Amino acid sequence: MATKATSSRTTGRPGVKKRIRKIFGDIHEVVQMPNLIEVQRESYEQFLRSDPATGYVSGLEKTLRSVFPIQDFAGTASLDIKEKDGYVLESPKYDVNECRQRGITYAAPMKVTLKLATFEVDAETETKSLIDIKEQDVYMGDIPLMTENGTFFINGTERVIVSQMHRSPGVLFDHDRGKTHSSGKYLFAARVIPYRGSWLDFEFDAKDIVNVRIDRKRKLPVTALLHALGLGDEDILHHFYDTVTWARAEGGWKVPFVLEQWRGSKPAFDIVDAKSGEVIFPAGQKISPRAANKAAKDGLEALLIPTEEIFGRYAARDLIDESTGRIWIEAGDEVSPENLDLLDKAGIDNLDLLDIDHISTGPWIRNTLKADKAPDRDHALADIYRVMRPGEPPTRETAEALFDGLFFDGDRYDLSAVGRVKLNMRLGLDCPDTVTTLRTDDILAVVKELVNLKDGKGEVDDIDNLGNRRVRSVGELLENQYRVGLLRMERAVKERMSSVDVSTVMPNDLINAKPAVAAVREFFGSSQLSQFMDQTNPLSEVTHKRRVSALGPGGLTRERAGFEVRDVHPTHYGRICPIETPEGPNIGLINSLSTFARVNKYGFIETPYRKVVDGKVTKDVIYLSAMEEQKHTVAQASAELTADGSFVEELVSARQNGEFVMAPRDTVTLMDVSPKQLVSVAASLIPFLENDDANRALMGSNMQRQAVPLIKADAPFVGTGMEETVARDSGAAISALRSGVVDQVDATRIVIRASGDIEPGQSGVDIYRLQKFERSNQSTCINQRPLVKVGDLIEKGDIIADGPSTEFGELALGRNVLVAFMPWNGYNYEDSILISERIVKEDVFTSIHIEEFEVMARDTKLGPEDITRDIPNVGEEALRNLDEAGIVYIGAEVHPGDILVGKITPKGESPMTPEEKLLRAIFGEKASDVRDTSLRLPPGVAGTIVDVRVFNRHGIEIDDRTRAIQNEEIERLAKDREDERAILNRATFNRLKDMLLGQVAAAAPKGIKKGVEIDEQVLADVERHEWWKFAVADDARQQQLEAVKAQYDTAVKAIQEKFEDRKEKLERGDELAPGVLKMVKVFVAVKRKLQPGDKMAGRHGNKGIISRILPQEDMPFLEDGTPVDFVLNPLGVPSRMNVGQIFETHLGWAARGLGKRIGEALDAWREANPNPEAGQPPEAVRELLKEIYGDNYAAEIDARNDEQIIDFAQSVRLGVPMGSPVFDGAVEKDVTDMLRLAGLDESGQVTLFDGRTGDAFDRKVTVGMKYVLKLHHLVDDKIHARSIGPYSLVTQQPLGGKAQFGGQRFGEMEVWALQAYGAAYTLQEMLTVKSDDVVGRTKVYEAIVKGDDTFEAGIPESFNVLVKEMRSLGLNVELSSLDDTDDDDGLAEAAE
């Protein structure tokens, strides 16, 4: 089987640790996969930046220019944007990291250059003359910026704007599928959807009248709309119908012979040739196409038709007696014997009739015209006005203004370029896409197409076709929101212009940018599409950015979305993943883009195809949207090709109009580029996806996004080859921006000296800061580790550091573990998992979670709160972890209830108890006037303090702890500065030395004579910084020296300025919320080991809960004594139909066996060559690697030297990494070949032994290496207990849920259970003292304190609430208590 190489760059240069993954796959991809987060970045780039070179205008500029110029109501002033460079985005005040730490928005201030022009208007001639123009830069608020990874920092949290899928603007034709009318006939409808503005609906009703609705209001006959457009009755009829002239002749009427009309018909009368009088077609006989063609060929031109046949036809024109003005017949009137007599008398021999035959052309528009009550344009406009503004009396002017504003005014109605393109395509129009309002021709064309559908011509549209749905990405969503804000601002500006003297003000005085800023803030802060980024692991980040949602403003709602919208559609192929979508109410509404998909400029999703020319597949790749693909026949990526690109088979499996067909090879026009273009990123990470049931694959792709990053990441032995792409594009692993040499490496940063020519003004140093133990949005741990050593050569794009869940630049969500499929004492019943103690002991699945806690000291009415170590009534033991400032130390081990930050709050004076008085007498004031409001660690959290950040309000004196943190940060910045300077000096002075050597000194520093030839000794005698004082005789060289000096000075200055700027920001104080004096954030790292109750999963939708952790010695073990790690239930496979996991297990078993073989060969070589330098080369190891990896990797393995081969062999001794790409992966034969090569049984099964008895199990068991993930559903986060806690305000019942520290609900069914057992007292205490009997609760507490265990139940608070609710309904219900007497009189009295 031919295999393709992973990457041509894996040549083992020093420094780049990179695996070679053995990929099973025949298909070589001709096009590179687009960057996975390109959708986000490109969209926002188009919103922010115009490109004068190509003439592209950014979305932001388009929006600004659509609102400006703003004119006042009188027309005496106009506020406009400067024509060129109208706006500028300045550099942001804080960088991304500062925004994350300070909790602020990463944004750039926008300045717009506005011109205020004032005019004088001549009252008589109404001409304007310009008086004055004032220009000024106006601040228009901050525009949030996107980070390199496609996210936004809003108030310090990382957010993603999800793209929205909505109905494309344009025209859609549809019918009701016979559901509206009882007869079941189809009622056709057309809808013109604009980008913004009024919707226009045309529809047939049950009487076959064509109606129109504007904005889903009351319906009107369509002819009212056509009249309003200025068309008369005759114009309307002529537009929809042809005209036939009937001429009076002897014995009837003479009509032109139209071949198509008569072919295949059965006339009810004899058809006579008007010229010869012969009967050509007798009555009652079907006219065959052959006979009709013969008649036409014989020269038949006109037919003679009996007079009765004219009755029931419709006149095409008004016929008027010109002398008297009497109308004989109106256009559209039916011809009857009466009006035919009138025409006879008038001597009219020729009649123009509408060509309506009731078969291929129906009288729908004519009938509508007759049903229309409005005779002319004015009446039609008035009718439309009454529908749109019911209750207001129309005048001609208001009606005309309203109608023009509805569809023909660019400010109120916008089809957008997309809408115009769709309209043109559907209706066959030819109108430039700059015309974004409706035209009369458009409306006529829509009605004509609708009538054609009714007449049985053409097809209705499919709403769910991706040609009729488009994607709105970040840029467009923000553009729409910003326009809303600007329009609000425009109103305010107009009012301000009319209320002040415009000649005395500047643009700044008129503009209040608050509405625009508020619109942007609202969009990023609270829009349904602006979401808190899912940052569990790198895959979840990438998937979140590639998500496409049909929900959100202007989209669908969960409740209204039917089955069709959610379903997979043939046009999804290669555009939207058919697998990855949530389970539950959002299924099918939230989707993921496929791997190769991209969004075009119109917002349609495109997918790439290879062109097929003359039956040969070329390397040309074109991207097509669903509309463009319709006319093509597309072959599968797996179709077999010859060397020259021709198809091997005569019939090729292909797609045509959404159907799968076997097409002849010469009809194929396109071919897929890759088998994985069908699925999304997450689904493409599942090996053997083709062997899994789709429902399970859906769960698998969703659960990979919940995998928690572990302390040690393991790339899968069995992957798909996509792992590296995801790690790189997600930004989790750091790739080098420029090539160079590694200068310094430590845990927190990598310094690379750039090689090659450095552009002037650019630093020659790249410093990469690594994120160390930072908290993600989901509290998982973000930690990056360097992969390079000092002196390594780095190429641009190389992975230099691993991030969370990555290993050597590959995505690594879980661990490879040894699993056995067998039952074990019921501990794997119903998907439970039995695991070995080794997994816990060796921290295989241990993860670190970082929790953030914050406390604020505010200014209260009673005085300021204080963060301090001096807390009343707290012993020294509780304060052991706090420093002098009252803040916990970094590195302290903390447990639930421990104080993290000491805080005291002033409290009002209240009457003192004797105890308080005593305390006050002993300790003075402090004890009474403050209360302890310290930040304590909540239950269920225990760990180590990893970071503390203190924020102080500007102008407040800072404490020692804050100063220490600041100094530490400044030292770090200074270290960066010194490193950059040192590398800059080294590089510059080496270059300077090369330029000076051999030159003659025209000027020199002190102590060196002029005219001396500069050599090594001369330079050694002078301090380095004095070298600049040399001048050389060679003018060209002297100019070069001066250029280097200028570049050096600029670089030194830039480094210093950067340092000063950051230092100043640190010392400036922080922007805190109003009323907050000080804020402290404490980060606690929690180590979560695997324990029973944690959820684990594979990549095939196979999930389970850990039921028991078994000692290693009790686990089933292999023949060599190795105990297995996991025991899974084999019954979890057959009914779930996810057989991919078995293939993975077998191939993983082979990978482990091959790794063992390599390890043995390596150990044998080491034994034979104790001194590697003097010994034999490791040829046996090299040959074994070549045998395992196959011919495609031979060149790559040969290119490595002996040392690299040993390193390589060492790195794969635990298991050889393999890749099985989706739909093109390893087949059964490949798996058995690998098992054979590893020296293992081809069945993949082995004899296992019981760890407790040492006996072999009865039959062989499937054992292998499987990739297992630990999911973000940890038992520690879910387990919860409460004795007492908060109560609901009204009902006084305990709250619910862990977050509220609530209780367990004792519901209706639980009450029934206790009633059934007759446990009356238990039930009573459940419903009273343990719930909402307030008095009883207190009494029970007091009794328990005194050691008494009796209690009395009182009245539950919810009863009182019920009584109050009944009273609010006007029912005076009172609860009367009686003394314990048995006489009925008492009851009677009470009742009275």
UniProtKB/Swiss-Prot annotation:
GO terms for molecular function: DNA binding; DNA-directed RNA polymerase activity; ribonucleoside binding. One of its GO terms (cellular component) is DNA-directed RNA polymerase complex. InterPro entries: DNA-dir_RNA_pol_bsu_ext_1_sf, DNA-dir_RNA_pol_bsu_external_1, DNA-dir_RNA_pol_su2, DNA-dir_RNAP_su2_dom, DNA-dir_RNAP_su2_hyb_sf, RNA_pol_bsu_bac, RNA_pol_bsu_CS, RNA_pol_bsu_protrusion. SUPFAM superfamilies: beta and beta-prime subunits of DNA dependent RNA-polymerase. Coiled coil: none annotated. NCBIfam families: PRK00405.1 (NF001616), rpoB (TIGR02013). This is DNA-directed RNA polymerase subunit beta.
